[in-house]
Amino acid sequence: MAKKRNTSKGLQALIDGKFIVHNDSFYKAIVAAATPDGTGPSPLEEDFEANFPDPLKFLPPKGDEPTERGETAYVPNPNRQDMFDGYTFVFYEQRQHSTLFAPISEGHGKVLFREVIPDETTVDDFVRYVKDVAGEKGLGEFEDGSEGKGVVVVRFNPVKGAGSEWFADFSRQVAQYLDHRLIEQNEFLDAILGNDASVLRRPLLPESSGIVAPPPTAGKCSLTQYLIPS
């Protein structure tokens, strides 16, 4: 259970083929269904399948993640379990790496961390590292044009505090060197719901400054299908 949709455990649940539900309201619905009405049996005792709360009616509230998908997109999909196979995600901020390590790994993707220190790490050094991960040399763009499976760089964008301007400039330069759109952390939810990791790996648009918005998005169950993340 969760209070938000776009959490590490929530994403992992979707990869694993589980529902995600809002903790308080779903608990209350189960308690109500399990409580006898007067002297008769409880609704669950009367007909478990018919009276068990529909998890899609108890989704956690929406956050600021860029997705407009309806509730049916949250139905467990076993095909998501290997959706990141062939993709390598490079992080340069430790908390982002820790947050997304489990769901990406669960989806058979690779997760790497390369520390970046403001005013110390150079764009050239980072680009060389990313290209080396991709099995390429030099400082130019990806040889495959950032299309299909391959390496994806996850952008770190602190909105305030020391280093915020430095990181913004760093990400722009990396994107331009690689001709590669650096993705935002909150884009993973929509990709997982659509079972399409390819939307996370795209070339930089010519008119872009390095930040490109993602494209618009268009049963019976057992208790083991539910994840209640903390």
Residue ranges and their predicted role:
Residues 75-80, 155-156:
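Predominantly eukaryotic Lys/Arg-rich, low-complexity intrinsically disordered regions
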Residues 80-86:
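Short, low-complexity disordered segments enriched in Ser/Pro/Gly and basic
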Residues 47-76:
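Short N-terminal or domain-adjacent regulatory/targeting segments
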Residues 1-57, 95-229:
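BRCT (BRCA1 C-terminal) domain core and associated BRCT-interaction motifs
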